[in-house]
């Protein structure tokens, strides 16, 4: 069978790979759609320190169960599923604490191990999440939105609080959805007007175009002297890492869900004077997936707002090149593999 492969930075191709067969405790999944993640873009650009080449990308998965390996129960061939794409060790202190998403030895599909940009994948049965009542295309949104929902949970965001969301890519939009779901007021910030329009459609109370507006002054105008209780950084840039601690109000919480690609310097007195809390947020957990699924069932229009483009398998490479050339022009690109499986 064929697979999309990032051969080296800036180069993608279609390669032949063996058809996998499920072993004991494993499930074969026929892939319907796969979303391109920001980590796939950084891998394409040669900026992802976690990847080795060549690599089949893809961990935002929509599919159907094709076959069950021996000893698998509770699942049915043909049912729609998404996949928890993180493989934790089960032994490190994070795993023992019940926080497998923070596993020291985690391997994510499409990053440290081969991904899902291929007609069939085989995964352990415990990684399968059956989903009904959500469009097949939109199943590919569950994983990235869950990363945003997890960041909201890490923030401990409460009803009535104000959160500034730095970045309106799909992770930032997941933060926006998760925050609105909790009854918070969202102020979304981005450089791209189109992404800000999506944030408003998903419930952001206010948006700030950082390309034309003094973000600090506008946040101050919108929140007064108190400032926001929470700032969630979903860009992964040194400027927004610093901006997060500058914007948050006294005794507030900063959550980093992006990570800067270079060391960041801070005016460290801000940490003390504001007595702020700074928290990291990594990936997501099954309960975050389940919350996103519930939200998509209740709000079936989310996919229409978030997905910018659906491309066939053969155009996956050119689509990545287009995203690389104009990252602000797309929120989410989804690759359709259904025709490939026909």
Across the structure, where does each feature detected by a protein language model lie?
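NAD(P)H dinucleotide-binding glycine-rich loop of Rossmann-like/cofactor-binding domains
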Residues: 89-166
């Amino acid at each position: 069978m064929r697979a999309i492969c990032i051969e080296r930075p800036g180069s993608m191709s279609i390669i032949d790979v063996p058809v996998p067969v499920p072993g004991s405790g494993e499930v074969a999944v026929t892939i319907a759609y796969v979303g391109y993640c920001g980590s796939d873009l950084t891998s394409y650009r040669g900026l992802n320190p976690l990847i080795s080449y060549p690599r089949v990308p893809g961990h935002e998965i929509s599919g159907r169960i094709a076959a069950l390996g021996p000893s698998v129960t509770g699942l049915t061939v043909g049912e729609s599923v998404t996949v928890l794409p993180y493989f934790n060790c089960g032994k490190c202190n994070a795993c023992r604490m019940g926080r497998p998403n923070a596993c020291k030895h985690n391997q994510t599909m499409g990053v440290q191990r081969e991904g899902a940009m291929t007609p069939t994948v085989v995964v352990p049965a415990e990684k399968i999440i059956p989903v009904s009542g959500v469009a097949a295309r939109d199943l590919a949104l569950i994983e990235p939105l869950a990363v945003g929902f997890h960041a909201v949970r890490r923030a401990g965001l409460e009803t009535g609080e104000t959160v500034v969301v730095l970045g309106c890519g799909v992770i930032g939009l997941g933060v926006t959805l998760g925050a609105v779901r909790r009854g918070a007021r969202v102020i979304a910030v981005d450089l791209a007007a189109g992404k800000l329009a999506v944030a408003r459609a998903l419930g952001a109370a206010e948006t700030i175009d950082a390309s034309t507006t003094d973000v600090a002054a506008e946040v101050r105008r919108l929140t007064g002297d108190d400032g926001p209780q929470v700032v969630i950084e979903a860009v992964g840039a040194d400027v927004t890492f610093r901006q997060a601690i500058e914007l948050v109000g006294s005794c507030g919480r900063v959550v980093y869900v992006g990570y800067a690609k270079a060391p960041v310097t801070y005016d460290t007195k801000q940490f003390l004077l504001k007595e702020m809390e700074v928290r990291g947020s990594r990936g997501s957990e099954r309960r975050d997936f389940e919350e996103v699924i519930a939200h998509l069932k209740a709000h079936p229009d989310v996919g229409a707002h978030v997905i910018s483009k659906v491309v066939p398998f053969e155009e996956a490479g050119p689509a990545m090149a287009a995203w690389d050339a104009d990252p602000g022009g797309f929120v989410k690109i989804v690759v359709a593999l259904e025709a490939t499986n026909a």
